[in-house]
């Protein structure tokens, strides 16, 4: 699925699967292609498509809707015309560098990972054992929300701060995010110890 990692969000490639040097037989894509308009697509190899050529055809009531197709093409034009993939790479690298600097200051940050504008900060109570700091992560997520920045917690223990800002996210926006994170981390560290 390229719902979260496609359309240049990772910065280095247009499709997330390209980072693994594979060519899938089926690719699904959704939300980003419509940028708020309900639109999704399935792309397959010729072999998969031909397998439907057995008397039972695939049917979709809204497939090929001209308005939706126009929206999808306009979104692709903006992604390419405004070099949003390049922006994701540049701003994402900027954020990763800043997150690594925060990791040096906050023992609770066990790992920083991601590509482009698909980022995560793993919070742990112990860097050696990687024991999850679930309460700290929830407190940071809630504290950031109170300061106007939305981020979710993910992972089996909800201890990873997951950030997927819009593709138009600028360095100025990144600086605001970083200021909110610094303030929130300091506040939560004082509160939870």
What are these regions (language model features)?
Residues 2-193:
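Conserved N-terminal phosphate-binding loop of PLP-dependent enzymes in the Aspartate aminotransferase
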